[in-house]
Amino acid sequence: MRLHRIELKNLNSLYGEQSVDLDGQLGDAPVFLILGPTGSGKSTLMDAIALALFGQTPRLSNARNEPDADARNVMSRGTGEAFARLEFSKKEEGARCRYRATWSCHRARKRADGDPQDPTRTLERLDSATGEWETLVSDKRAKFFQPELDRVLEGLTVKDFQRSMLLAQGEFAAFLKATETERAAILERLTNTSEYREIGARAAKRRS
C-alpha cells in the first residue's frame, strides 16, 4: 500500500480543513520527519490515517468499552463535524489501483452542543479511464462497509497498523513483543514477502 494524500477536518488540535499531499510535497523522499511541539497535531495525522482505514485510532477505540474511548472524541472541541480521508493505492492483478477511504462524523444538526451521530464510512475507487471517483460503499452500518474495506485492505487490521506503522505512546515495544507468527503475518502483508517464500520453496525443491 502506498499513501498519497491525507485530508482532515476538525480533528483534535487541527481545526478546519487540512491536507498533506505526500506526493507533491514530499516527492520521492524515502524518509521524512514530522516535527512540531507537543499538541501541534503530529499524532493527529496518524489518527486520520487510522480513522479513514479502520474507523478507530490507537488512542481511542470502542473495543475498550469506555465512554471516553469512543473514536468520535477526536472531533475538535467546539465544532459540529469532522472527517478523515486517506487517498492510497495498491497493486491489483499487476496494475496499481487508487482508492479513497473516508471516516466522517457530525453532531446533531451539526451544532457543537449536539449529540454525536454514528460515523459514516466511505470507500471510493478512481476510474483510470475517466479520472472520476466511483463510490464502492458509503454507509453507517458495518455489515455494508466492512466487507468492502476488508477486501481492499487484504486482511490488514488496526492491530497490524499499530504494531508496524504507528506505535502510540506506551506501545513502542508492541511489534517486538508480538509472537513470531504475528510478526511474520504483519511483515508478509506489508512487504509482500509471499513472493520470497515461494522462491525459497522452489530453491529448496531444486536442491533436494
Where are these regions (language model features)?
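Extreme N-terminal "head/tail" segments of very large remodeling/mechanoenzyme assemblies
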Residues: 1-153, 160-162
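Extended, Lys/Glu-rich alpha-helical coiled-coil stalks
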Residues: 33, 37, 130-135, 140-146, ...
